[in-house]
């Protein structure tokens, strides 16, 4: 129902122990709520939020906590109003590293989550066929991951995540290892597919331009221990076109986001696309 939060983090902190036994605080007192939005006709629609910050500021840690792959030291994480205690089908995750099973074909990789969750064979077949078409892998259903480019492997990862139709999609720098043109193509693909789903996306990057182009809101984090220093709304409408990156309003927002990062304590690196 309207007003419900899709994802909530309340006072979340997480520390680790270094190889030398020293405590390392990855994130400290993370707080945000992503509202479950509805269209005027009552349809559930998802938001696109981005976590932006220098390398090592805890962005990936936040995603892993929401995914249920790790647990916070303090604080509470809710997805669809339910406390996160472990992984679940309501959340899907796409990683930067290629994670396809090398012994399975493209179709078998996409089908994997459906199969282990005991979906009927015909439903699995239909979903896989549709997703292969949606992500632009027509003709590659029987190919193995080692024969695919990096961009194509990430298309497989996105399709595999979408197969279970999660309400929340977590993406950990999925395009970081791709060349500039392929990264742009994948951004376009992601926005198109996201626009056809009701999923909320939480996307990690350290590329300022990528964050602005994709997001409805940008959570800017400082260097470790990562803390959200500003929630930056992105005022541009949708659908979006890559040409907007050359406009004055885009450049003005880029400079504002960069100024937020410069004001933050600590050291780290962020990237501005060229």
Question: For each predicted feature, which ranges?
Answer:
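Helix-to-loop junction immediately C-terminal to a conserved catalytic motif
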Residues: 67
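Conserved ABC transporter NBD signature motif
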Residues: 75-86
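Signature (C-motif/LSGGQ) region and adjacent switch/coupling loops
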Residues: 87, 107, 133, 141-144
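Short coil-to-helix segment of the ABC ATPase nucleotide-binding domain corresponding to the Q-loop/switch region
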Residues: 104-112
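Conserved ABC ATPase "signature" region
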Residues: 111, 115-140, 192
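Conserved signature/switch motifs of ABC ATPase nucleotide-binding domains
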Residues: 143-146, 164
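Hydrophobic anchor residue at the start of the ABC signature
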Residues: 158
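Catalytic Walker B motif of ABC-type/P-loop ATPase nucleotide-binding domains
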Residues: 169-172
């Amino acid at each position: 129902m309207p007003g419900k939060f899709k994802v909530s983090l309340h006072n979340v902190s997480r520390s680790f122990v270094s190889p030398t036994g020293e405590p390392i605080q990855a994130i400290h007192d993370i707080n945000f709520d992503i509202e479950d939005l509805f269209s005027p006709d009552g349809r559930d629609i998802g938001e696109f939020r981005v976590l932006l910050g220098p390398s090592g500021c805890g962005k990936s840690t936040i995603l892993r906590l929401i995914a249920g792959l790790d647990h916070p030291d303090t604080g509470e994480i809710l997805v669809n109003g339910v406390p996160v205690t472990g992984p679940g089908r309501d959340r899907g995750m796409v990683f930067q590293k290629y994670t396809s099973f090398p012994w399975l074909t493209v179709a078998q990789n996409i089908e994997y989550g459906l199969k282990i969750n005991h979906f009927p064979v015909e439903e699995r077949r239909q979903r896989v066929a549709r997703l292969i078409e949606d992500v632009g892998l027509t003709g590659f259903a029987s190919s193995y991951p080692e024969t695919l480019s990096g961009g194509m492997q990430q298309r497989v990862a996105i399709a595999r995540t979408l197969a279970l139709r999660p309400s929340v999609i977590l993406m950990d720098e999925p395009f970081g290892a791709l060349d500039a043109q392929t990264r742009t193509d994948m951004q376009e693909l992601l926005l198109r597919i996201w626009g056809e789903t009701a999923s909320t996306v939480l996307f990690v990057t350290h590329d300022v331009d990528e964050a602005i182009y994709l997001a409805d809101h940008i959570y800017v984090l400082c260097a470790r221990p990562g803390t959200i220093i500003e929630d930056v709304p992105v005022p541009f409408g949708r659908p979006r076109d890559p040409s907007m990156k050359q406009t004055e309003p885009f450049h003005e927002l880029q400079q504002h986001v960069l100024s937020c990062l410069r004001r933050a304590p600590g050291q780290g690196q962020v990237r501005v696309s060229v």
